[in-house]
């Protein structure tokens, strides 16, 4: 459950460490975002020498969320942190590596490149 002003960790090697959600994409009344949803965010913390700088506005897809997500078989999945991966306008990841596990729901939402780069899909 990510909403405006939520802070997320960045799970890729673009140079951003933390982002702040400024808009959940998908309609003017859309309040919350879950795993696999795209958000617009600003970079709050970045490593020196990275591809993105602090203050830059980026698009990101949520790969881990603390709020549990129900699966079609009735099971639930939740993570210890909220994390996102920065993406380009064509939904391809901006980084070349993904850190930590990602949810299987990304495959259903057509983020195949992120799923293939991830070390573990849960």
Swiss-Prot record:
PANTHER family: 50S/60S RIBOSOMAL PROTEIN L14/L23, LARGE RIBOSOMAL SUBUNIT PROTEIN UL14M. Part of the 50S ribosomal subunit. Forms a cluster with proteins L3 and L19. In the 70S ribosome, L14 and L19 interact and together make contacts with the 16S rRNA in bridges B5 and B8. The keyword Membrane does not apply. It comes from Corynebacterium diphtheriae (strain ATCC 700971 / NCTC 13129 / Biotype gravis). NCBIfam families: rplN_bact. Belongs to the universal ribosomal protein uL14 family. GO terms for biological process: translation. It comes from the Bacteria. One of its GO terms (molecular function) is large ribosomal subunit rRNA binding. InterPro entries: Ribosomal_uL14 (IPR000218), Ribosomal_uL14_bac-type (IPR005745), Ribosomal_uL14_CS (IPR019972), Ribosomal_uL14_sf (IPR036853). One of its GO terms (cellular component) is cytosolic large ribosomal subunit. Binds to 23S rRNA. Forms part of two intersubunit bridges in the 70S ribosome. Signal peptide: none annotated. This is Large ribosomal subunit protein uL14. The keyword RNA-binding applies. SUPFAM superfamilies: Ribosomal protein L14.
